[in-house]
Curated annotation (Swiss-Prot):
Ranges annotated as biased composition (Basic and acidic residues): 259-275
UniProt protein name: Centrosomal protein 43
Gene: Cep43
Primary site of residence: cytoplasm
Top-level taxonomic group: Eukaryota
GO annotations of cellular component type: cell projection; centriole; centrosome; nucleus; perinuclear region of cytoplasm
Pfam families documented for this protein: FOP_dimer
Biased composition (Polar residues): 163-172
Organism expressing this protein natively: Rattus norvegicus (Rat)
Subunit and partners: Homodimer. Part of a ternary complex that contains CEP350, CEP43 and MAPRE1. Interacts directly with CEP350 and MAPRE1. Interacts with CEP19. Interacts (via N-terminus) with CEP350 (via C-terminus).
Biased composition (Basic residues): 175-186
Chain ranges passing through the membrane: none
GO biological process terms held by the UniProt record: cell projection organization; microtubule anchoring; positive regulation of cell growth; positive regulation of cell migration; positive regulation of cell population proliferation
């Protein structure tokens, strides 16, 4: 019975549905609903195609920059900075706007690419801070290196006359002497103020050339002083050898039996009568002393003491000559033997004279030579003093 009732209800529902559909179709409501539904479906499909084909909002300049290696490195540094300080909300906006949700490098890869070692103390901060520090050190590096080069050079920068330092000027190797370039007249200072910048650049080279010329002049003066000192010493040696008689001629004379003492080695040496007798031959062979008498024509006269001394010497020599004559040494053979010690001119002039007269003449000449040698000592006394030391070059004993 229940089944029959259910079947009856189902049949009634289908009949009601069919009746409703037929009624709606007849009134046009069902067709209008079907058309609206069909239009809504087509509109939904068209809108879906537009959404799929719609281009997203992209920053073209940022996209080009991120395509380069440096741009990706900068974006990675900024992302690492935000991650280091846990700025998650900023990262949520940063990644979509930059379209860098994937592809950015981590901290380790960034440190390796930048050459930063974590052991250097950079763990306490982001990598961006270490990059800025290194850039600042590189900026300060060239100036400190230039300062180190200036200090290692050892020479301070040369100053121009206007007081400006010239860095490009090379240090001079020429020894600088004290007092150079320190004194300047007021006219030079006023002229320096009026000079242009070009002349101020050329002044260091001019000062170098002036220092070179001054040092060369100083060396030339030094050389001339040494040359004059050497020439004076050689002339003094020659005068000593010319004015002092030869010792070998006196000592090697075998005519006299008695040994003859050596004369004193001074310009104004005096000998005893016996020494004069033994040195007649050597004195007669010295023509340069006789020829020098003419140059002393204008010399002042001898003093009375010297004339008295010469007269006493003449008297002693006359006595010696008389003794020699009394001994019988006036023969022709002895006369010829004495002539062998005289020059040819003396032999021709005195061939007919006796030995006593020859001795007197020679002794008179010897006394005059001695007196003239004393005068030469007075006139030609060397008073030069060495310019290289405080000690006299040489000293002479005047009788």
């Amino acid at each position: 019975m229940a089944a029959t009732t259910a079947a009856v209800v189902a049949e009634e529902d289908t009949e009601l549905r069919d009746l409703l559909v037929q009624t709606l179709e007849n009134s046009g409501v069902l067709n209008r609903i079907k058309a609206e539904l069909r239009a809504a479906v087509f509109l939904a499909l068209e809108e879906q195609e537009k959404v799929e084909n719609k281009t997203p909002l992209v920053n073209e300049s940022l996209k080009k920059f991120l395509n380069t290696k440096d741009g990706r490195l900068v974006a990675s540094l900024v992302a690492e900075f935000l991650q280091f300080f846990n700025l998650d909300f900023t990262l949520a906006v940063f990644h979509p706007e930059t379209s860098t949700i994937q592809g950015l490098e981590g901290r380790e890869n960034l440190a390796r690419d930048l050459g930063i070692i974590e052991a250097e103390g950079t763990v306490g901060g982001p990598l961006l801070l270490e990059v800025i520090r290194r850039c600042q050190q590189k900026e300060k590096g060239p100036t400190s290196v230039e300062g180190a080069l200036d200090l290692s050079d050892g020479h301070p920068p040369s100053k121009s006359p206007e007081g400006k330092t010239s860095v490009n000027s090379t240090p001079s190797k020429i020894p600088r002497y004290k007092g150079q370039g320190k004194k300047k007249t007021s006219g030079q200072k006023s002229g320096d103020k009026k000079t242009s910048s070009e002349t101020s650049q050329s002044e260091p080279s001019v000062s170098l050339s002036e220092s070179k010329s001054k040092s060369s002049l100083h060396s030339l003066v030094h050389e001339t002083r040494i040359a004059s000192f050497l020439s004076n010493s050689t002339v003094d040696a020659k005068d000593k050898s010319a004015l002092c008689p030869d010792e070998d001629d006196v000592e090697g004379d075998s005519f006299f039996d008695d040994p003859i003492p050596k004369p004193e080695k001074t310009y104004g040496w005096r000998s005893e009568p016996r020494k004069q007798v033994g040195g007649l031959a050597s004195l007669s062979d010295k023509p340069h002393l006789r020829s020098g008498l003419s140059s002393l024509a204008g010399a002042p006269s001898l003093t009375d003491a010297e004339s008295k001394r010469g007269s006493t010497v003449l008297k002693d020599l006359k006595l010696v000559g008389e003794k020699i004559g009394s001994l019988g040494l006036g023969s022709g053979e002895d006369e010829d033997y004495v002539d062998d010690f005289n020059s040819a001119s003396h032999r021709s002039e005195k061939s007919e004279l006796s030995i006593g007269e020859e001795i007197e003449e020679d002794l008179s000449m010897g006394v005059e030579d001695v007196n003239t040698s004393d005068k030469l000592d007075d006139l030609t006394q060397d008073l030069t003093v060495s310019q290289l030391s405080d000690v006299a070059d040489y000293l002479e004993d005047v009788a």
